[in-house]
Amino acid sequence: LLPSGAAWIAAARTLICADLHLEKGSAYAQRGQLLPPYDTRETLRRLSLDAATHAPERIVLLGDTLHDAAAPGRIDPDDAQTLLAIARGRSLLWIVGNHDPDGPGALPGPMPGDTAETLTVDTLTLRHEPLAGEQSGEVAGHLHPCARVAGKGRTVRRRCFVTDGRRLILPAYGAYAGGLSIRGAAFAGMFARPPLVGAIGSRRVHAVSWGSVRGEL
C-alpha cells in the first residue's frame, strides 16, 4: 500500500488506484465554487510518479476516474497528454464507475486502454463499488475511506486503506476527492471483524488499530 493512495501488487506488476475524479475542480467552478483548477494536474503528477517508481506492466483505474460525463470537454490538452504518457508501453484498464460509466470513450482523441466492470487478478476481484456484505478477495473503491485517528491529545483526519484481511477498500486518489468516515453507516456490515486501517501520511502508510479510530465530530 502506497502513501499516494495506490495499491501495488508486485507479483502481478499491477498498480491500482481508485476515484481519481479528474476535473472535479472545474465542475465545482461551473457551479460557482471557485477552487484552484489544478487538481487534475496534481493527481496525474502523482500517478506519473507512482508509475515511474514501480514500472507497472498494468495500471488499473478502479472507477470514477472522471468526475462527471462532461469532464472530457474540460480536461486541459496537456493533462490529456500526460495521461497518454502514463499509459505508454503498458496495459491500462478502466474499471467503470458511477461517475464515468463510459470509461475513457468520451475523452478527446484516441485514449489507450480497455474498459471493464471487474478484473480478476489471481484470487482478487477488482471492482469500483464494493458489494454488500462480507466479500472475500474483493478490492474496491467508491467509498473514499477516511479515518479520524486519536493520539497525543488530539485527533487527525486522514485518507486511509481499510481491510479485514478478506477485502480491501482503497482511498480516493484524486486531489479533491474527499472522504467518508470509516466509522459511518456506509461501512457498516462490510467487515467480518474489526478492520485494520492504513492511514496515509506524507511519506508512508501508518497502521492504525480500529480502537484508535474515532467517529466524526
Go through each PLM region and give its residues.
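Extended recognition/assembly regions associated with phosphoester-bond processing machinery
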Residues: 1-217
